[in-house]
Amino acid sequence: MELNELTITKAIVEGFFQKFSSCLETDVAIVGGGPAGLVAGYFLARAGKKVVLYERKLSLGGGMWGGGMLFNEIVVQKTALPILDLFGIRWKKYDENHYSADSIEAVSTLISQAVKAGLTVFNCISAEDVLMREDRVIGLVINWSAVEIARLHVDPLSVRSRFVIDSTGHATEIVRIVQTKVPGSLNTPSGKLEGEKSMWADKAETLTLSNTREVFPGLYVAGMSANATYGGPRMGPIFGGMLMSGQKVAEQIIRAL
């Protein structure tokens, strides 16, 4: 049978429409496709929850692809090895608490396993606002990233979810939106975004887990977003905290659903 250009177009348009329509209402919407968001999506999907992830860029993986300063190796601590083993990511021992892995294998495996577990991903889509009802986040307002980049005056669309995860990293995009729209309402010491502190890898990795929590009704933070929200330091190219934070936020939301 001859390949037909119109049939190719129909298959893409109809397939995307069906996928997008099925995700207008979900249990969880994740914003940010870095390691924390991907791991959260994996565990939520594996638990049978309807979960969607929005990533503003064309590719997922956040800063993990480049390892440290474009040296495409990453480091994780010993406590994160069970997650690497679960995903089938190979690692090498450097010393008793530092283990390295190929960043390309790590990212590509996280993406593949998360999608195969049932996570639906929409790339090139940004969240520009949240849906709010009585001081609770109940969804997202989304638009194509290209619209934002081109500065086009195009109204967005809305999607609903029972919970939202901000895993946008240093940018803390969703937390910043809520802070702007509902000043002083965050579950932080000041009621505001505390801000990211300078590099301190050991402390940052510990705080990433303790800062992974609900920061506003219906809104959770994970990964570097958690540290930036609660005033923790950055950690650099060690990713164990990111992975474990993704698992922790998934477990918290599963209990809440």
Each predicted region: which residue ranges?
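Short hydrophobic core segments
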Residues: 29-31, 54, 158-170
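A conserved FAD-binding loop/helix module that cradles the flavin
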Residues: 229-257
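N-terminal glycine-rich dinucleotide-binding loop that anchors FAD/FMN and/or NAD(P) in oxidoreductases
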Residues: 66-90
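Feature captures the FAD/FMN-dependent oxidoreductase FAD-binding
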Residues: 88-163, 167
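N-terminal Rossmann-like FAD-binding beta1-loop-alpha1 element of flavoenzymes
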Residues: 19-52, 242, 250-254
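Flavin (primarily FAD) binding-site architecture
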Residues: 166-181
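Extreme N-terminal leader/targeting segments of oxidoreductases
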Residues: 1-28, 143-144, 192, 197-201, ...
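Glycine-rich FAD pyrophosphate-binding loop
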Residues: 45-65
